[in-house]
Amino acid sequence: SENMICGGKGINVSALLANLGYESTALGFVAGFTGAEIEKRAKELGFASDFIHVKNGMSRINVKMKSDEETEINGMGPDIRPEDVDALFKKLDGLKEGDVLVLSGSIPSMISHHIYEEIMRRLEGRGIRTVVDAEKDLLLDVLPLKPFLIKPNNHELGQMFGRELKTEEEIIECGKELQNRGAVNVL
């Protein structure tokens, strides 16, 4: 059987919040017919979107084939230019005190690997809480900026500390270390 799902961590967060009765606005980059489909599905799922429309390329198509083993084919995504990133920054400048910004997922290859840090620095002192759900270095790099909440899974937590975490005590110990490094809350 075939199934098409619009996803990505940001889309999934907004969809979950809508299901729980909370308003949110999904931000990010879309392009081409797949970007139009993402916007359409966002509306159907009950949340607002305010995407930057990228001129070249199309939003990624990731194919997952399931049988005894899962095979993954991930598309490249659109060609995000510096002016597209500037447009995102302008949208983020509209956030107000008390707002919550979720930074989630991987960073497209043509964007600075430090964009989460850049965004958090830009928001510093404005009373905006940041939640970061990302892998290893993306997460470790933002800790000095004191994110309100980080959400590493067990595997990601083990990657950050260079070991497999087998007990609840080890997980708690690593979570506390992340708080010592700057995270306000670790989920």
What are these regions (language model features)?
Residues L95-V100, K146:
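Short acidic/histidine-rich motifs immediately flanking catalytic phosphotransfer sites
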Residues M110-E118:
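Active-site core of PLP-dependent enzymes with the aminotransferase class I/II
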Residues E117-L187:
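Conserved phosphate/ATP/ADP-binding segment of small-molecule kinases
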Residues P78-R81, I107-I111, L138-L140, Q159:
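Short, small-residue-enriched loops and turns at beta-alpha junctions
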Residues V54, M65-E97:
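Conserved phosphate-binding/catalytic loop of the ribokinase/pfkB sugar-kinase fold
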